[in-house]
Amino acid sequence: MRTDQTKPRRILTAVFALLLAAATLAPLGSQGVDQARLQPLREYIKMSWSTLTRSNRDLLQALPDPKMPRKPGEPWLLYISPQESRTRVQDELTRELGADAMKRIEIRVLPRDVLSIREHGLLYLPRPYVVPGGRFNEMYGWDSYFIQVGLLRDGEIARARDMVENFLYEIVHYGTILNANRTYYLSRSQPPFLTRMILELYERTGDKAWLQGTVPAIDRYYRFWTTAPHDVPDVGLSRYFDRGTGPAPEVVADEKDERGRTHYDRAREYYRTHDVTDYDEALYYDSRRDRLTDLFYKGDRSMRESGFDPSSRFGALNVDVIHYAPVCLNTLLYVMEDDAARIMDTLGDSSAARAWRQRAASRRDLINTMMWDEQAGLYYDYNVRTRQLRRYDFATTYFPLWAGIASPAQAARVRDNLKRFEAPGGLLTSTEVTGNQWDAPFGWAPLQMIAVNGLRRYGFTDDANRLAAKFVALVSKEFDEHGTIVEKYDVRRRESDVAADIKFGYSANQIGFGWTNGAVLDLIAGMK
C-alpha cells in the first residue's frame, strides 16, 4: 500500500509527465503530425499485420491458447460446425499442412449443446484473420473493427475482406459473431460493428454483388441483439447477456494474480471487505456461505460480452451489467440500423431501407430520451430495473457523437465536459480509479478513436486534434522506449507499465497490438 511518504514523489512524477507531454506534443500539434518522426512506428504497424495474421496454412500457430492449459503430447483440438464438411476441412488442412502435422490435430464436430463442452479448442474459420496479440491468439469481435480500420488505412484490402468474410461465416455456422473463435466463447458475442466493417470495405471495393450477399447475415445478427435474452421488451433497448452459466473457463484457468488467486477469488474477497451500495449485493454474493451466486457468474460473463472487463461502470465488479441498457451497445445498434438502411438504398430496396431507417429513428429517440442527462451534459447507461441513469462518468458518452445521434446542443455539452476525461496522454476511460483496467487512469485506443471522431463530426476540430495528438505522442514515446505497441496505457502518467495498478482481471499489458495499431493510424490520418 502506498503511504503518505510517496506523495511528494508522485507529485513530482505528475509534474514531470505534464512537462514531458508538452515537449512531446510540440511536433504533434493540432496543425498536423511529423510524419518522419512517426515513420518507424508506422513501419512497425505495417509489419505487424503479417505477424499477427493467423491462417489455416499456419494453423499450428493459431491453435495454441495462452489462456488454457494443455498437457504435453495432447492433440490440438479444432472444432467445426455440424453444417461444415469434415472431409472438406480435413482435406484442405492436409494440403496446407501435410500429413505429419495433421497427426497433431484432432478435428471435432461441435455437439448440439455447445455449452456442455469441457475440452476446449479453436473454432475453424475459412479465411486468414488478424489477432490482437499476446494472450489473445484468436479473432475477436470488436477488436476486429479497429484492426480493419488500420488494414484499410494501410491498403490491406484483401486482409480486411477476409476479416469480414470470417464474421459472415461465424454468423451462419456459430449463430453470431463470437467474442472470439474459441469454444468457451460460443455463449457470447461482443459490441457489434459488423455493418461498419461491411460499409467501410464496400467503400473501397464497390463490389455490389458482394454487398448483396451480406444482407442475410446482417438480418440474423441484428435479431441476435434485438430478441431475448438481449432485448428489454418494455424498454425498447438492448443489453449484454451471456447465454452460459457458471465460471468462465478461461478466467478460472488464466486470470490469476501473483498469489495464484483467480478473478473469482478476488471478487469474493472484495465482497467480504467492502460495503456494496451500487446494487443488491445478495443477488451476486451469498455472505453466509462466502459464495458467488449463479447470477454473479451470469453477470460476469455478460460483462465480458460488453468488452469492458472489468470496470465499475455497472457497479462493483461490473456484474450488474445484465440490468442495464448500455449507451455503447444501443448506439452501435443504431449504427447497424442506419448502416443497413444505407446498404438497402445502395441495393435499390427502398422499402427495406425505409424500415431500417424507422428503427434507427426510434432508437435514436430512445437514447436521447432515456440516456441523456441534461443536468450533467453527458450520456449515461440506463438501469432497466430502477428506471434510472447510473451517473458514472465513462468515455462511452462519446459514442452518440461518433454515431451522429446527439443534437448540436448535446454535443456541445459533452464537449464542455471533456476536461473531466482529458489527461496528459489522452482520454481517460472513466473518472474513477477503481483498480479495474477499464477505469482511470487507463486509456484505450478504441475509445480515443471514437471520441476524437465524435468531436470532429460536430466541428470540435481543435479538441479532436489535441486529444489525438496526446494519445499518438504517448504511443510513440512508449514505442521509442520499448519497441512495441501495447493494449492499454496509463494516460495520466503517460506510460505502458500498468500492472501494479490493476487489481482485477489480468494485469499484464499485451503486446501487438491490433486495435491500438488500427486506431493510431486513424488518429494520425485525422490530424493531417
Model-derived features: positions:
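Bacterial N-terminal signal peptides
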Residues: 14-23
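Extended glycan-interaction surfaces of carbohydrate-active proteins
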Residues: 40-138, 162-181, 235-325, 365-443, ...
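Inter-helical turn/loop segments and adjacent helix faces that build the functional surface
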Residues: 201-212, 340-355, 458-461
